[in-house]
């Protein structure tokens, strides 16, 4: 019998393993990226306090005003740019990148590159 691969379970397993070493502090918060089929979300999180410092997603009003889709690379670049600008406004310039168990490719890489171009260091 052929068994089907549970890709979500594999991603969650990878994410758990990575989260053991990726930890956001006040000096270097964690830039966490979550990717769904139609949208992308990014948060800057201080894990010591359990506080989200900045957030951006493809559901934000600024994103929708640009008339982009959240399920493609162009939309992911816009989300990366938005989260970086909001983090810099809060005084955060250095972060630790958390890809959420996803492969560093496509939309995940686009968020990271756009955040770097907008001024975040990681």
Swiss-Prot record:
GO molecular function: 5S rRNA binding; structural constituent of ribosome
Pfam families to which the protein is assigned, alphabetical: Ribosomal_L18p
GO-annotated biological processes: translation
Keywords carried by this UniProt record: Ribonucleoprotein, Ribosomal protein, RNA-binding, rRNA-binding
Domain of life: Bacteria
UniProt GO cellular component terms: cytosolic large ribosomal subunit
Keyword match Cell membrane: no
Alphabetical list of InterPro entries matching this protein: Ribosomal_uL18_bac-type, Ribosomal_uL18_bac/euk
Keyword DNA-binding: no
Membrane-spanning residues: none
PANTHER family, sorted: 39S RIBOSOMAL PROTEIN L18, MITOCHONDRIAL (PTHR12899), LARGE RIBOSOMAL SUBUNIT PROTEIN UL18M (PTHR12899:SF3)
Family: Belongs to the universal ribosomal protein uL18 family.
Assembly behavior: Part of the 50S ribosomal subunit; part of the 5S rRNA/L5/L18/L25 subcomplex. Contacts the 5S and 23S rRNAs.
Functional description taken from the UniProt entry: This is one of the proteins that bind and probably mediate the attachment of the 5S RNA into the large ribosomal subunit, where it forms part of the central protuberance.
The protein, known as: Large ribosomal subunit protein uL18
Lineage of source species: Bacteria, Bacillati, Bacillota, Clostridia, Eubacteriales
